[in-house]
């Protein structure tokens, strides 16, 4: 969701670009680390299942956050990256990808108000 907004990317980009899917996966792995610290068991197979789901989506499909970006609407980034960062701090897990995504999205949202 967040990566698609920052990249302006439809599902096709994640289906075809190793760089885009790698960035998405890096954000997901931060969530997995936090989940494990909280006693929630997420595994590599969960990421594999996400890729299987993603591969079946329409290449022209867009995440809700990308649609928000295109309409210059405030996003739900605080519910995504903001919460990941908060929980990362709680469990002493670094979240550099989600931190970067939050900063970029908040900066873009600020720019829309100018």
List the model feature ranges, each with a label:
Residues 1-26:
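Anionic-ligand binding region
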Residues 21-114:
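NAD(P)-dependent Rossmann-like dehydrogenase/reductase catalytic/cofactor-binding core
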């Amino acid at each position: 969701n967040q990566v698609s907004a920052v990249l302006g990317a439809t599902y096709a980009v994640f289906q075809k670009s190793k760089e885009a899917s790698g960035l998405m996966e890096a954000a997901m792995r931060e969530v997995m680390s936090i989940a494990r610290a909280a006693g929630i068991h997420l595994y590599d197979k969960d990421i594999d299942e996400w890729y299987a789901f993603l591969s079946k989506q329409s290449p022209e499909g867009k995440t809700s956050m990308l649609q928000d970006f295109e309409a210059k609407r405030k996003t739900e980034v605080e519910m995504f990256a903001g919460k990941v960062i908060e929980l990362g701090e709680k469990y002493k897990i670094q979240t550099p990808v989600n931190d970067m995504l939050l900063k970029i999205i908040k900066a873009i949202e600020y720019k829309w108000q100018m």
